[in-house]
Regions:
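Negatively charged, low-complexity tracts enriched in Asp/Glu with abundant Ser/Thr
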Residues: 2-53
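Short acidic DE-rich linear segments
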Residues: 132-138
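Active-site-proximal segments of catalytic enzyme domains
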Residues: 111-123, 127-132
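A short, surface-exposed interaction/processing loop segment used at functional sites
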Residues: 85-118
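Amphipathic, interaction-prone secondary-structure segments
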Residues: 41-84, 89
Length: 138
């Protein structure tokens, strides 16, 4: 399941907070089967509480599991040669972003996201696999 993010924001912090809320919603929808299952509720609670957002000079790093798993990066400067402020980048490794293409922009909205991280790219337009499938099949 993916969540479409359509809202626009004026600050990186607000855009990231909205994106994390969407990821939390996606996580709950992926694993929650209903009822008052204690295990599912604990998993959801731990996931929601485990986000770490660390601002650096060029990127804001977003991690899950209390910083143990790199989730993605957001460009937080206007001086990047390839990307604009707010662009979402997939992880190339634990401490570096993949600089091939942005997966969306937290300030502009208009992208899909899921709890596992920024979506993969397909084709020259940069549409994600899941977004493309939803458009064709759903």
């Amino acid at each position: 399941m993916t969540v479409a993010i359509k809202k626009t924001f004026k600050t990186i912090e607000d855009g990231i907070a909205n994106m994390i809320a969407a990821c939390n919603h996606d996580y709950k929808g992926t694993f929650y089967v209903g009822g008052d299952d204690e295990v599912h509720n604990k998993m959801i609670e731990e996931f929601n509480a485990g986000w770490v957002v660390k601002e650096g000079s060029k990127y804001t790093k977003i991690s899950t599991k209390n910083g143990g798993c790199a989730w993605g990066f957001v460009v937080n400067t206007d001086n990047d040669k390839k990307f604009k402020k707010g662009d979402i980048l997939k992880c190339a490794g634990f401490s570096a972003p993949a600089r091939n293409a942005a997966r969306g922009n937290v300030l502009d909205g208009g992208f899909s996201i899921n709890w596992t991280g920024p979506l993969y790219l397909v084709g020259p337009a940069g549409y994600s696999i899941k977004s493309t499938k939803e458009g064709i099949f759903g």
